[in-house]
Amino acid sequence: MFIKASLDKSKVVKIRKKYGIPKGNITYTDLDKPAKPLFSAKHKLVGKPDYIVKRKEGHIPVEVKSSSVEIPYKSHIMQLAAYCLLVEDVYNAKVPYGIIVYGDRQFKIPYSNILKTRLIITIDEMRNCLRTNGRLKEKA
């Protein structure tokens, strides 16, 4: 499933410059106008990355944040990992990394098997917590 971006060339140039979005074909955007959420039946996960850029090495989700930081927040890395998982499943495509943009700085986050596993464990823990009415289980 491919969701075509409906942006004219001049707007794409401005967006790329403003957010430091890498070269490639923007195949999805949610920042300029609301886009249809991506849904993975396999992982029962839904989300809307700000951009997806198709490059030679694969599909790259891009998440734009309004804050400025020295290092990315762990929660933002997990959010980006969820977008990588969605793109991998929905587009049936390789996702080598994602990008988080903060102000004038961006971070390229490798989408590794370790990050994917941490994400799936975190999602499972969150679902378990919801099933137990929000109570965390005591660890021995």
Role assignments for model-derived ranges:
Residues 45-70, 79-85:
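Conserved catalytic cores of phosphodiester-cleaving nucleases, focusing on short active-site segments
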Residues 24-56, 75:
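Active-site metal-binding core of divalent-cation-utilizing nuclease and nuclease-like domains
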